[in-house]
């Protein structure tokens, strides 16, 4: 059994090692139960373990373990509130990253279906999807704004986005476009040392909520902090990682690290 959350660790994709680690963590979670209200993964986990007379989490079958994994959607509320996380406790529990390890192990062992591959390609290419939908914002927003509509039902069948889920609308202008078109970029002069930051806007701010980034820039500049937006940034790659595709995630992470590392060398905070 190896407690590791490093996707390049030699035991990371070892299924038997993973199953033993899930036994350990599930037993801790069952004894704690602090996270019963955060997502359906925990009530399902507790239901399985409670069904055993001795309440031994290691008696869960691989199918039951996988069912718990499927319920996790990486909101990370459990991690924020967990008293046993790495660095704070010797048990080093990181439930979201363990679920991610399980997803990646299953993909490495069993692969994915053609439908899943197509869905992953559609959902993980957030920069492409974002650029297209911002350019067609009036049309795109009308198409996705009504839960349960024909368009949303088609999306549910094809790319796997639940038809009843409320989706954030796309902006008519990307955050990066707004930032580079501004006529006044210099921060206000204030007493004390002036700082410098390089912004990493995230896909949500870049394509759907640029007002969040705009407010951040205005607050920083009002307080004498110079803002820059390094060119060449990409999606953080989280959709690839959550789909079990470490290779694509690592490619995007390397690109972002290269860009942001240069910004740090120029004296910026991120």
Could you tell me what each predicted segment is?
Residues 1-20, 40-64, 193-196:
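Short, charged low-complexity linear segments at domain edges
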Residues 21-37:
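Mature N-terminal segment immediately following signal peptide/propeptide cleavage
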Residues 23-26, 56-235, 240-270:
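Iron-sulfur-cluster electron-transfer modules
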Residues 27-30, 40-44, 221:
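Short amphipathic alpha-helical segments enriched in leucine
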Residues 35, 40-45, 78, 83-87:
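Detector for the c-type heme attachment site
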């Amino acid at each position: 059994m190896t407690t590791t959350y490093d996707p390049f660790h030699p035991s990371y994709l070892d299924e038997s090692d993973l199953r033993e680690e899930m036994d350990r963590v599930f037993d801790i979670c069952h004894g704690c139960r602090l996270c019963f209200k955060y997502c359906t993964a925990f009530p399902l986990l507790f239901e399985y373990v409670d069904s055993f007379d001795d309440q031994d989490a290691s008696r869960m079958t691989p199918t039951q373990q996988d069912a718990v994994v499927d319920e996790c959607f990486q909101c990370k509320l459990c991690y924020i509130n967990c008293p046993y996380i790495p660095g704070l406790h010797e048990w080093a529990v990181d439930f979201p990253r363990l679920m991610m390890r399980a997803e990646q192990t299953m993909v490495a062992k069993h692969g994915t279906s053609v439908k899943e591959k197509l869905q992953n390609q559609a959902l993980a290419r957030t920069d492409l999807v974002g650029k297209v939908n911002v350019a067609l914002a009036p049309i795109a927003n009308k198409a996705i704004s009504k839960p349960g509509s024909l368009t949303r039902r088609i999306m549910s069948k094809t790319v796997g986005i639940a038809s009843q889920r409320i989706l954030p609308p796309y902006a008519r202008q990307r955050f990066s476009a707004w930032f580079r078109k501004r006529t006044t970029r210099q921060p206000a002069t204030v007493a004390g040392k002036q700082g410098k930051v390089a912004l990493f806007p995230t896909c949500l701010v870049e394509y759907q909520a640029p007002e969040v980034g705009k407010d951040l820039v205005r607050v920083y500049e009002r307080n004498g902090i110079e803002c820059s937006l390094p060119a060449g940034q990409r999606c953080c790659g989280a959709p690839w990682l959550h789909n079990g595709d470490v290779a694509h995630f690592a490619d995007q992470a390397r690109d972002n690290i290269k860009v942001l590392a240069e910004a740090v060398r120029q004296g910026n905070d991120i």
